[in-house]
Amino acid sequence: MLVMGGIVGSGIFINPYVVAQQVHTPFLILGVWIFGGMVALAGALVYAELAARRPEVGGQYAYLRDAFHPAVAFVYGWTLLLVTQTGGMAAVAVTFARYFLEITHAPVSDAVIAAAALAALSIINCLGVRAGSNVQSTLMLLKIVAIAALVGAGLSVARPAQNVSAALLDRPVSMSLVLAIGAALTPVLFAYGGWQTTSFVAAEMKNSTRDLPRALLMGVIGVIAIYVSVTYVCVHVLGPDGLKNTSTPASAVMRAALGEPGARFIAIGITISTLGFLSHGMLTAPRVYFAMAEDGVFFRSVAWIHPRTAAPAVAIVLQGVVATIIALSGRYEQILNYVTSVDFILFGITGISLLIFRNRQPESTGFRAPGHPFTTLFFVISCFLVVASTIFKYPANSAIGLTILLAGVPVYFFWRKS
C-alpha cells in the first residue's frame, strides 16, 4: 500500500488529457502509459537492489552519498526540499483543496484549505511511521474503490466514442513523432513518480532486504494496471478528440456513464487520492533531511527524534512549512513544470550508482535486479531522454530547476566550511 499510495495521486485523473494533446491515437495514448510503466518498473528494480544493499535512513540520499560524494547527496536533498518534493506536494494540496471546495462549497480560499491539509498531515506523521502508514493504507483502499468505480462505469458505456481512428500512428515516423512521444511521457512519468520514496524508510522496516523489493515490484505493477485501465476507459468513452478537449477526463467519463451524481462521486475520489499522496510524502521524504542532519550538512535540530513516537518530528515540520509556503504563494504551477527535469536527472544518476556498487561489490546476498546491466541501462538512458525532452519542451522552467539544483553545490561546501 505504501508504494501504490506514493504513486497514485491526482495525475492519473488529469494527465490522460495532457497526453492526448500530444499524441492522438488510442495506440499511442495507451502505449505511452505502458512505456512509462516499464520505465517505472525498471526503476523499481534498480531501487529495490539499492535498498537491499543500503537499507539506510534517507534511501536515495544514502545511495548517492556512498556511490559518489556527499556533495551529490546534499544536492539531491537540497532539491527535494526546495523543488521536487515540496513543490509537488504544494501543487497536489491545492488540487485537493479545489476538489474539496467543489464538493463542500466552503467559504474559504483553496490556499487556506491546502495549508490546513499540509498542517494536519504533518501532525499525523509526527506521531510515528505506524500511525502515518495506517492513514496511508486506509486512504489507498478508498482510492482503489474510487478507481474501480471509474473503470467499471467507463466499461458500462456500451457505445464507444464515434470516429475513433484505427490508425496506430497519427503521423509518419519522424523526429516530430519522437518529440511528441517525449512530450507525452513528461506528464506520464510525473504521474508514475513516487515509487522511489518508499526506500527512504528502509531503515525503519523490520526486514527491509526482503520486504522492500517485494513492495516496490508489486506496487509498481499494480499501478501500471490501474493507470492503463483508467486511460483505456477514458479513450473508450471520450475518444482521443474528446479526451484532449477536457481537463477533467475522470469527471467526463463518470458524467457520461452515471450523470452528475457520478461526476460528484469521482470528485470525492480524487479528493481522497490527493490526500493520500500528501500523506505518503509527509511520511517518507523527511527521512532524507534527517539523514543530511546526521551527516552534518544540515541543521542539527532536524535530526531530533521524538522520544515517544521515534519520528523525525523537526524534519517533518520543516517540510510541511516549506510546502505550505509554496502552496500559499500561488507559484506551484511554475514549479511543477521543472520538477520533472530535476527529478529525472537525479533518477538517472542514482541508476548509475547501482553500476558503481555492482563494480565495487559484485557479490550480494540480497535482492539483485533481474536483467542487470540491461535493466539498469534502460532506466538510466530513459531518464536522460526524458530530461532532454523536458528541456526542449519547457526551456525556461527547466533552466530555473537546473539553477536551483546547481546552486546546491556551493551551498554544500559553504555549509561544510562553516
Language model segments and positions:
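C-terminal membrane-solvent junction of multi-pass transporters and transport-like membrane proteins
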Residues: 301-313, 347-397
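Hydrophobic transmembrane alpha-helices that form the core helical bundles
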Residues: 18-20, 40-118, 122-126, 131, ...
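TM-loop-TM module centered on a large, flexible mid-protein loop between adjacent transmembrane helices
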Residues: 62-63, 69, 102-106, 172, ...
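Helix-loop-helix junctions that connect adjacent transmembrane segments
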Residues: 26, 30, 107-109, 138-268, ...
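Transmembrane helix-loop junctions in multi-pass membrane proteins
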Residues: 12-18, 93, 124-130, 160, ...
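Hydrophobic alpha-helical segments of multi-pass membrane transport proteins
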Residues: 147-150, 289, 339-365, 382, ...
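Membrane-interface "cap" regions at the ends of multi-pass membrane proteins
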Residues: 1-27, 40-45, 56-57, 68, ...
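A generic transmembrane alpha-helix motif of multi-pass inner-membrane proteins
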Residues: 158, 338, 342-343, 371-418
